Amino acid sequence: MRFDVVTLFPDMFGLVRDQGVTGRAHAQGLWALHAWNPRDFTHDVHRTVDDRPYGGGPGMVMMAAPLEAAVAAAQAARAAQGLQAAPVILLSPAGRRYDQAEATTLAAGTGAIFICGRYEGVDQRFIERCVTHELSLGDFVLSGGELAALAMMDAAVRLLPGVLNDGDSALQDSFNAALDGLLDSPHYTRPEVYEGVPVPQPLLSGHHANIARWRREQSLRLTASRRPELIERARGEGRLSKADERFLASLAGERES
């Protein structure tokens, strides 16, 4: 797994390369990260990567040529390692929203090249010539694509075999297929009683079936309350059992009473 990032701020990516579980995995060689600054692919004394937009308007637009040259260099470096050409992902508010399914797809491949835009955006001709995918974190605007790329890489890398100490941890994450796309249940650790609030009794029982059922019901309760559309999706995909449906019906009864 190799990620390449085209960015004006390569130092930002030390966060995912050097810190936490992704940093440890990088040190172990489970994935690689290479940053490419488009300023290194300019030919003027000022290393210009942006200019005013045609037609007028506020802000500046990133120029196509430095970006395309950076992508070409990244693809060539991948080819030299025997890797196939990577998808080129532009972080953009016009992109498809990134979710756990996208992270799983990304983790199953050999990596990607992320394009981190700045200013008002990037020249459309670069998008048409080089970009294969556009992705977004959500309906809000960031100062650049770097934070979005960091989040997307983190979500994908933690799914790689050997990255997490407990291989089952990722399977129990919210939105994961092992949870049928639902939110995860609440978690508790020591002490057994904190400020007068005890750990729920089922978690102390040692009865694995009861613990599993309690966690499933809490997952259903939380998802129905916070993200009801995920319940409908799971239902439409046939992921809810009869016991799940009975519990959800009881929740509806609680709300009505």
From Swiss-Prot:
SUPFAM superfamilies: alpha/beta knot
GO CC entries: cytosol
UniProt keyword annotations, A-Z: Cytoplasm, Methyltransferase, S-adenosyl-L-methionine, Transferase, tRNA processing
Subunit structure: Homodimer.
Protein location: Cytoplasm
GO biological-process terms attached to the record: tRNA N1-guanine methylation
Top-rank lineage group of the source organism: Bacteria
Family the entry assigns: Belongs to the RNA methyltransferase TrmD family.
Chief location bin: cytoplasm
Residues bound to S-adenosyl-L-methionine: G117, L137, G138, D139, F140, V141, L142
Entries under Pfam families matching the protein: tRNA_m1G_MT
Function: Specifically methylates guanosine-37 in various tRNAs.
Protein name stated in the entry: tRNA (guanine-N(1)-)-methyltransferase
Membrane spanning stretches: none
CDD domains per record: TrmD-like
One GO MF term attached to the UniProt entry: tRNA (guanine(37)-N1)-methyltransferase activity
The keyword Chaperone is assigned to this record: no
Reaction equations catalysed: guanosine(37) in tRNA + S-adenosyl-L-methionine = N(1)-methylguanosine(37) in tRNA + S-adenosyl-L-homocysteine + H(+)
EC number(s) on file: 2.1.1.228
